[in-house]
């Protein structure tokens, strides 16, 4: 998806990195190195960040439209560019401009998508010295969701997120995203999961069957994220958004990633638009999107 959406104009690459949602998310076990084995189904939606990468002679620079984002080596896009030059031995630089639309720290893989997009763009600007597998390997070292973001669409992710299997695409639907103004610590959510039994786990096989059957309502019925109960206990506003979304006509709703964004699946544009308008009175980060395959 990223390579197809990247346009080269001379020494510049223009690309988009899209948001993802979790149709299912299960945490299976904790490894000795502290990482967790997960099993989840992810889906791309049409909300995107716009990224421009210019090929320069030396140095890496980052600029964004959000003043609070780091524009140094702490930014995952910077890490992506740095990793590319170290992996290839190329002596060069990059000027990276990111226009953020995807909320930060929202459970939507905004940063991971930026990372994958920058790796793809710089690789193309230099004549594709790295294979797709090599890009995926670098991406996995920078973030668990990065490998998924290279191709997006509907995929099953296992391991720590690096073992990917393409699935039948999700049927067309309207996806409403609402992020409350809170910051959730993913590490803290995992810590809570480690210390308490998971009572309800996703029906991953059933979700795959529903995808194979192009059954939107079966997909909606099987939305499940084991992190949701933990996050919602800490931040009741998450549960409140989910309840309101369903009352507004969503076929179903669930939290994405470690949160705090909640998304609802709508089969009718007018219901989705009306719900989005009602949330926009209360929250800044409200986005009416569509499934993207």
Model-derived segments and spans:
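Short, basic/glycine-rich phosphate-binding loops at helix/coil junctions
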Residues: 57-70, 118, 213-223
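Solvent-exposed alpha-helices and their adjacent loops that cap or buttress functional pockets
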Residues: 7, 43-44, 140-141, 147-150, ...
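Contiguous, small/hydrophobic- and glycine-enriched helical/loop subdomains that border
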Residues: 93, 115, 119-156
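Glycine/serine-rich anion-binding loops at beta->alpha junctions
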Residues: 97-126, 144, 251-266
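Conserved, helical-rich catalytic subdomain that frames metal- and/or nucleotide-binding sites
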Residues: 151, 156-252, 267-270, 277-280, ...
């Amino acid at each position: 998806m990223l390579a197809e959406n990247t346009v080269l104009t001379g020494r510049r690459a223009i690309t988009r990195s899209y948001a993802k949602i979790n149709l299912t998310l299960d945490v299976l076990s904790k490894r000795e190195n502290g990482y967790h084995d997960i099993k989840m189904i992810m889906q791309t939606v049409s909300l995107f960040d716009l990224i421009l990468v210019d090929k320069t002679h030396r140095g890496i620079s980052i600029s964004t439209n959000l003043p609070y984002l780091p524009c140094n080596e702490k930014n995952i896009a910077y890490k992506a560019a740095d990793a590319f030059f170290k992996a290839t031995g190329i002596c060069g630089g990059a000027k990276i401009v990111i226009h953020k639309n995807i909320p930060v720290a929202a459970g939507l893989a905004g940063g991971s998508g930026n990372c994958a997009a920058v790796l793809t763009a710089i690789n193309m600007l230099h004549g594709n010295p790295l294979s797709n597998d090599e890009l995926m390997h670098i991406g996995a070292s920078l973030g668990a969701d990065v490998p998924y973001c290279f191709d997006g669409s509907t995929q099953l992710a296992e391991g720590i997120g690096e073992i990917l299997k393409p699935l039948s695409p999700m049927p067309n639907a309207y996806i409403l995203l609402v992020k409350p103004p809170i910051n959730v610590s993913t590490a803290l959510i995992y810590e809570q999961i480690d210390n308490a039994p998971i009572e309800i786990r996703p029906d991953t096989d059933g979700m795959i069957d529903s995808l194979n059957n192009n059954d939107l309502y079966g997909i909606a019925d099987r939305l499940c994220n084991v992190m949701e109960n933990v996050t919602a206990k800490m931040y009741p506003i998450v549960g409140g958004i989910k309840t309101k979304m369903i009352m507004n006509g969503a076929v179903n709703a669930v939290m994405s990633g470690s949160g705090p964004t909640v998304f609802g699946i709508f089969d009718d544009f007018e219901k989705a638009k009306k719900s989005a308008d009602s949330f926009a009175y209360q929250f800044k980060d409200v986005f009416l999107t569509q499934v993207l395959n």
